[in-house]
């Protein structure tokens, strides 16, 4: 024993401090083979045993597996098979309920068949078109109007059928007969498809003017102004170029014509008149309280060779003693109203034939200057 030499036969070499499965379960390999279970190979690969025989024994144990064990292990693994087409043989087995054991194609076909059945049984969330249910149970209907580019609210209804019918009515109104509705068998005749109005129709509607209900002022006709504005009564209105539009009355009611002969071939002419226009008092001039009032006279000139004058008079009104000349005026009026027709013609200054020839008014009594002269004392 020189220098601390160690006798190899006396002291055994040191072993690994790691405990392996073989020291605890010496019959582990046999039990795995009997139960067809695979042992953990990771411990064998990472075994740090220095013994060459132990390593060789582990390698030998790994190669001891049979082919049957491999088949049993891989049968339980679910394969990932992606097939695009179906085989007729496999579809026949699926339809008859016979499945190939261990065939991934059969499992894939079964899953696709189940999905097809679910999709066929699946229903729409809303059975009707254009409606949706509120959280509190009501049904709302709305439709998209392509002309406006927005959704049109149709309202809230108690049942889904009412909301669907409201959608159908709006769809027929917007799209006409091409609309997709919930109840195609029901046709509502009252709902008429409204087409978009054309620009031409809009222009025609805008061009139609509304009637004016207010009183309009029209210009006096030229032929009337030439015929009837020459007398003293019409001269008082000579400076007025407009008058209120009144209903037209034919001149044969008042006996005023335009140079007609005895045959009466000329047609009737008309002029504007108003109620109370035959009264010759001063009420229309603005000083009715001061001027004398005359009775109403309705005159008619007969178109024949002999001029006759028909009068309808009322009782003479009392005159107010507002001027010194009221007595003379009253006597003048009494003579003018109650005398014979010949005296009336003499008072007017011409007979009926002269009136027709000179185109003057036969009922001219006095001019506006005479009225102003009589009323100077009051003003």
UniProtKB/Swiss-Prot annotation:
GO terms for biological process: ethylene-activated signaling pathway; regulation of gene expression; response to hypoxia. Constitutive in flowers, leaves, stems, and roots. It is found in: Nucleus. One of its GO terms (molecular function) is DNA-binding transcription factor activity. Residues 190-206 have a biased composition (Polar residues). Keywords: Activator, DNA-binding, Ethylene signaling pathway, Nucleus, Transcription, Transcription regulation. Induction: Up-regulated by darkness, ethylene and Botrytis cinerea. Gene3D superfamilies: AP2/ERF domain (3.30.730.10). GO terms for cellular component: nucleus. The keyword Nucleus applies. Residues 127-184 bind DNA. PROSITE patterns: AP2_ERF (PS51032). SUPFAM superfamilies: DNA-binding domain. InterPro entries: AP2/ERF_dom (IPR001471), AP2/ERF_dom_sf (IPR036955), DNA-bd_dom_sf (IPR016177), ERF_plant (IPR044808). Residues 185-208 are annotated as: Disordered. Disruption phenotype: Lethal when homozygous. Interacts with MED25 and SINAT2. Belongs to the AP2/ERF transcription factor family. ERF subfamily. Transcription factor involved in carotenoid biosynthesis regulation. Binds to the 5'-ATCTA-3' element present in the promoter of phytoene synthase (PSY) and phytoene desaturase (PDS). Involved in ethylene response and resistance to necrotrophic pathogens. Acts as a downstream regulator in the ethylene signaling pathway. Partially redundant with RAP2-12. This is Ethylene-responsive transcription factor RAP2-2. It comes from Arabidopsis thaliana (Mouse-ear cress).
